[in-house]
Every structure is written in structure tokens, then in C-alpha cells.
Amino acid sequence: MTQYRHQNSRRRFLQRSILLSAGCSLPPLLAAQNRQVERIGLQLYTLREELSQDFDGTLARVAALGFQEMEFAGYYDRSAAEIKKALDDNGLSSPAAHIQMTAVRSDLQREIDFAAEIGQRYIVVPSIAASERSTDDYKRHAETLNRAGEKTQAAGIKMAYHNHSFEFERAGNRAHYDTLLEETAPELVDFELDLFWIAHAGVDPMPYLDGHPGRFSMLHVKDRDQFGRMTSVGSGTINFAEIFSQADTAGFKHFFIEHDNPGDGFASIARSIYTVRNVQF
């Protein structure tokens, strides 16, 4: 039964993606239900150049567009108190930040203290070095995440891992991503599913969302066009309504819009937040 449900989910996902890539609108029954994302977030890597030039002004413009939650990927030489004040001044919060695995290994307590002062609830490892991607490496990474999760738990913070496409490479019959999911403790480690990168790997997210309920507290809401390029949300082929509809099963709590290299960052996030606001599921 589980295999049949996963095959069915994959078939629906591919059918709807094909419709979207062909420029067709989805039938109302497929496209919309009656829920919407309540609090829309932004992964600030999208605006890294703007933040480096005008940190406070950039946050103000982001807030004016209607974003409410910020996920950091660097703090631009500011203290936790300065970050917290800038967020408060603009009516923003920051549930999460990307922290490199090297910092998790070497200076985790500092990262915990920094995150706690800002009010963050997740420390997210954004990637794994290319030199550390063997089967045994992934098992060690899972152990590292578990140990870190034990330490962060005491501060009310949870560890998480963010995917690219390389984690879906397989060793035998098992994807490396499966190793991370299956060898980390659900009470200690969550996952942030990047919708562009899982699509870029040619992998249907539905079996993961169905098969690992409650593990995916965060999403990177990103789009991919028919040529495989990253694009602003709403300009590509990913069926967000179908993915968002798995919120209760998957455990989605935070929806962070992102574009790695948007060109015009503010134009991109304006288009993207408009799209996400209008996704019904």
C-alpha cells in the first residue's frame, strides 16, 4: 500500500509539473483548496550583496514587502544584540540560521548562545564539503548532527540539515540523504527541504514527505524552469500547492523563499512572495 501511494504521488507530481512547464493553468480542483502560508520567510542569502551594503535598509525593504521571518546565512559583523534590534525595529523574527559544519564541530556553544539571543529555534547545516561525501562520511555526519542536537536541545534549539542535489546520489540501493534521515534521531534533528535542489536531482519529494512524517520543519521555497535553471518562485515548473498540501504530514512550520543568484534581488523576492501568498492548498 505504501509503495502504491508513493507511486501515485509521484505520478500526480509529474503530471502537474508537465502542465505547468507547458504554460497551462491547473484545473481548480487540482490547483486550490483553502489554506495559505500564514507567515512567509526569506533566506537572506538571496540578498547577501544588498545586506553587505545596507543591512538595516535592506531589512526594512524586506519587511515592507510583507516578509515576516528571516533565515540568516551570515551576520555581517554584527553582534546578536544588533541583529535582534534590527529585527525588532522592523517587526521581523528569525527562526533559523545556516551555520557551517565546521562551526558546529569546533564552536557549537558560541553558535547556540548567538542563536538563543536572537530567538532562533533551529541551527541548520547548509551543506557538506565535497571531500566529505563518502558513505562512511555521511554516517559520521549523522552522528555529528545527533551529538550537536543533544547540546542544542538544552537551549530549546534544534539541529537541522539543508540539502542540495548531491545528497541524492546513491551508494548501492540507498541515497546518501536516506542515511542522514534514517541515522539521525527525530527528536534531535530536523530537515530543511530545498525544493529546487531535490527537483534538480530528479527526485520526487512526495515519498520523503510521506515516509518521514514530521521531519521537515522548514522549506526552501525555490523554483526551477524547464531548462533546469533556478528562477523566481512562480516562474518555473514546481507545483507548490501539492507540496504545501503535505504540511501536516511533513511538519512544515517555516517557508523560506530563496534564489541563489537572482540578478535583481528585490524584483525576484517581490515576484516570489506574490506567488507564495496566492498558493492555496
Which positions does each model-derived feature cover?
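Active-site acidic/histidine proton-transfer and metal-coordination neighborhood
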Residues: 69, 76, 101-190
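A cross-domain feature marking catalytic cores of carbohydrate-active enzymes
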Residues: 42-46, 72-74, 96-101, 125-128, ...
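Acidic-and-aromatic substrate-binding clefts and catalytic sites of carbohydrate-active enzymes
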Residues: 48-52, 71-82, 100-108, 130-136, ...
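Acidic/histidine-rich catalytic cores of soluble enzymes
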Residues: 70, 154-237, 244
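N-terminal secretory signal peptides and thylakoid transit peptides that target proteins
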Residues: 2-24
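C-terminal segment of N-terminal export signals and the immediately downstream linker at the start
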Residues: 28-53, 60-61
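Acidic (Asp/Glu)-rich catalytic clusters
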Residues: 34-35, 59-64, 78-94, 107-120, ...
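Conserved, mostly hydrophobic/aromatic
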Residues: 42, 62, 70, 87, ...
